[in-house]
């Protein structure tokens, strides 16, 4: 089992008094548009952003259809947009090839940079071609946009409506998340990789500590952490629950770009050239974060206490040392070295060193009988480099099955998927049930070296078992959590802080108010909000949507909740699928504002995109749960508490009995600027885009 020693302590701070910014806030400040003069952005603020680049992949055609459906005919800034083909490249059906051709023709017509099937995974292309560049903000309509954080680029995912908005107007919106600091200290043992770090983090801190947070990595270990390791860690901050995973700009990163420039063999690359690297060196001299920057929490892990870790089966929240699993004699049927997580050159070489440790192709450790080991480079460039280095030949000599540079089995597409009853071990990022094939299969995640060792021995194994070397000494991982709550005394102090009112757009209410109706549960998913059986019925009238809203959660919701009420729920409200009706059904019910401890990211984006307002107030959830502790359980409960949100003052007040009753809670919240108000006034992001054309 996973063993660790964790200490928890806390200190207090108040957002209202903080002037400084962390690195995430600094980058957002640079890419925010139409801010009021002198406005300094912080976590919680809603801002309009104009990202440096926006990438979409096989979903580019649905984005294009939405773009054209809005009435748009011209890409606002063609150099901002990148399209790639990577997910379903093994599919040679006429339907898929037609879609690919449509994307290619659209890109050509609008002078968009386009990378065809076979060039590589979109995220790797963004890295190799310099679109994701240190200290810029880069988005993509894909959940693993966090990967760019390994290069010091603030990468975060968007939904298709956002992508269409960026195509048409150059911008969309973002609410700056709470920022968690993750300190990596100590020296990583020889052979332990970035994959081991992130798999351990997902398993050790598995109680949603970083859910919907931005992460900033710090620590004395960073200079010794190669860029490929950083990219792997940043990539899987998505599975950890975060919205970004940002590494700082340091000498290791700048040297990586200098080497990249040398490899390109030209000084005329549009994004990676002597001028951009010199500018980066100058920017790197500026402090990474202000001394008085605020962080929601700090997590610390001592890398010196790590060993090889494996997650699963079928969950990244379950992690064990490879030594523990090896003793369980877990037989495998398939192994995978593919995806944007771990298919870079160093990953392929790591696996090659396990199957051919001497370098002699006549002394290769063969893949075990009955095991299929699939391998694909993250890009065509990486495959060419692996062929040149000899790593590719070693893997094929061992019996690996090559696949084209693309997503393939990681996304459950193409050859080599898990069959019912099979067990697979993979260097990818997700092992959710059914993700890589059958729902009746078991999937584990591990580093390339562990995957290769397991393929050779036919069971989950450590590299040391293949190489006949000593196992890494292990006695438990040392971790620490420093929480950073806003306490009630500071909440009260916030009201005395110097005020800078938010300007209110004509037609937008200065305040929202209503009685709080409590749906006391965490992780209410989109199916609970709007039943899946209605999702693909396009003709459901508004009245029907209102009737069925929340029926899978509580059939009594329909009669207990009235138009104008404010629904309040627990944490991670709206998790699950991307159905927009989860937001529009609440609007149909007459609910204009939902409050929770936290929201699922896609639900949060779909809400604003459809003009449903949301507020995260964890302190309110705590107070309500204290109020009803020991009371008979009610799924939907009218509380008799009232909330008023003063948008101009960015403050909420909760009272008892009426809006004029005794104050229960008073707290500052993120600012909703004029740009976001305009989206709401226009009925959502699509309406706003149409108004800009």
Curated annotation (Swiss-Prot):
Gene Ontology molecular function, alphabetical: 4 iron, 4 sulfur cluster binding; homoaconitate hydratase activity; metal ion binding
SUPFAM superfamilies reported in the protein's UniProt record: Aconitase iron-sulfur domain, LeuD/IlvD-like
PROSITE patterns: ACONITASE_1 (PS00450), ACONITASE_2 (PS01244)
Record GO biological process: lysine biosynthetic process via aminoadipic acid
CC cofactor: [4Fe-4S] cluster
Cited InterPro entries: Acnase/IPM_dHydase_lsu_aba_1/3, Acoase/IPM_deHydtase_lsu_aba, Aconitase/3IPM_dehydase_swvl, Aconitase_4Fe-4S_BS, Aconitase_4Fe-4S_dom, AconitaseA/IPMdHydase_ssu_swvl, Homoaconitase_mito, Homoaconitase_swivel
More about this protein: Present with 7350 molecules/cell in log phase SD medium.
PANTHER family, sorted: HOMOACONITASE, MITOCHONDRIAL, HOMOACONITASE, MITOCHONDRIAL-RELATED
Name the UniProt record assigns to this protein: Homoaconitase, mitochondrial
């Amino acid at each position: 089992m996973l063993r660790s020693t964790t200490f928890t302590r806390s200190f207090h701070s108040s957002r209202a008094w903080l002037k400084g910014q962390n690195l995430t806030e600094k980058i957002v400040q640079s890419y925010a548009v139409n801010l009021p003069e002198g406005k300094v952005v912080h976590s919680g603020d809603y801002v309009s952003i104009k990202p440096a680049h926006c990438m979409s992949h096989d979903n580019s055609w649905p984005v294009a259809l939405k773009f054209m459906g809005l009435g748009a005919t011209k890409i606002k800034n063609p150099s901002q947009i990148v399209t790639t083909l990577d997910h379903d490249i093994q599919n040679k059906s006429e339907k898929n090839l037609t879609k690919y051709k449509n994307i290619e023709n659209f890109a050509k017509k609008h002078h968009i940079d386009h990378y065809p099937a076979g060039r590589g995974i979109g995220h790797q292309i963004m890295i190799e071609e310099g679109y994701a560049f240190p200290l810029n903000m880069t988005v993509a309509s894909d959940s693993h946009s966090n990967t760019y954080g390994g290069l010091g680029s603030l990468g975060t995912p968007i939904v298709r409506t956002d992508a269409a908005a960026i195509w048409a107007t150059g911008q969309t919106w973002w609410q700056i998340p709470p920022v968690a600091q993750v300190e990596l200290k100590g020296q990583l043992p020889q052979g332990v990789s970035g994959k081991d770090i992130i798999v351990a983090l997902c398993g050790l801190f598995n109680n949603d500590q970083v859910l919907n947070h931005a992460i900033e990595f710090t620590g004395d270990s960073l200079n010794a952490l190669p860029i490929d390791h950083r990219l792997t860690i940043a990539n899987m901050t998505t599975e950890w629950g975060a919205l970004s995973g940002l590494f700082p700009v340091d000498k290791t990163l700048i040297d990586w770009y200098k080497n990249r420039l040398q490899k390109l063999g030209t000084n005329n690359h549009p994004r990676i050239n002597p001028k951009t690297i010199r500018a980066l060196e100058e920017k790197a001299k500026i402090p990474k974060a202000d001394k008085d920057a605020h962080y929601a929490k700090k997590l610390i892990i001592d890398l010196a206490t790590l060993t090889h870790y494996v997650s699963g089966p079928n969950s990244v929240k379950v992690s064990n040392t490879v030594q523990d699993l090896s003793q369980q004699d877990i037989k495998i049927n398939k192994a995978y070295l593919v995806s944007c997580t771990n298919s870079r050159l160093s990953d392929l070489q790591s696996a090659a060193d396990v199957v051919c440790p001497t370098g002699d192709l006549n002394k290769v450790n063969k893949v075990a009988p009955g095991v299929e080991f699939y391998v694909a480079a993250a890009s065509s460039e990486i495959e060419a480099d692996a062929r040149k280095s000899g790593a590719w030949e070693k893997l094929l000599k061992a019996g690996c099955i090559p696949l084209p540079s693309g997503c393939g089995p990681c996304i459950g597409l193409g050859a080599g998927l898990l069959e019912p009853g099979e067990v697979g071990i993979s260097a990818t990022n997700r092992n959710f049930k059914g993700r890589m094939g059958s729902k009746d299969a078991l999937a584990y995640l591990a580093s390339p070296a562990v995957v290769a060792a397991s393929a050779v021995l036919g069971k989950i194994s450590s590299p040391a078992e293949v190489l006949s070397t000593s196992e890494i000494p292990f006695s438990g991982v040392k971790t620490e959590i420093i929480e950073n709550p806003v306490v009630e005394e500071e909440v009260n102090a916030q009201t005395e802080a110097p005020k800078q009112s938010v300007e209110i757009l004509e037609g937008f209410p200065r305040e929202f108010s209503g009685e709080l109706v409590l749906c006391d549960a965490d992780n209410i998913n989109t199916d609970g909000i709007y039943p899946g059986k209605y999702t693909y019925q396009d003709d459901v009238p508004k009245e029907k949507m209102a009737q069925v809203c929340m029926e899978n959660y509580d059939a009594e919701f329909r009669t207990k909740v009235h138009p104008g009420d404010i629904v309040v729920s627990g944490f991670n409200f709206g998790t699950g699928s991307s159905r927009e009706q989860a937001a529009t059904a609440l609007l149909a019910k007459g609910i204009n504002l939902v409050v929770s401890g936290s929201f699922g990211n896609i639900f949060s984006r779909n809400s604003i995109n459809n003009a449903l307002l949301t507020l995260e107030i964890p302190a309110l959830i705590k107070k309500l749960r204290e109020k009803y502790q020991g009371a008979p359980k009610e799924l939907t409960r009218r509380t008799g508490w009232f909330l008023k949100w003063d948008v101009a003052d960015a403050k909420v007040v909760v009272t008892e009995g009426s809006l004029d009753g005794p104050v229960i809670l008073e707290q500052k919240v993120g600012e909703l600027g004029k740009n976001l108000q305009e989206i709401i006034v226009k009925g959502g992001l699509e309406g706003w885009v149409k108004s800009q054309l």
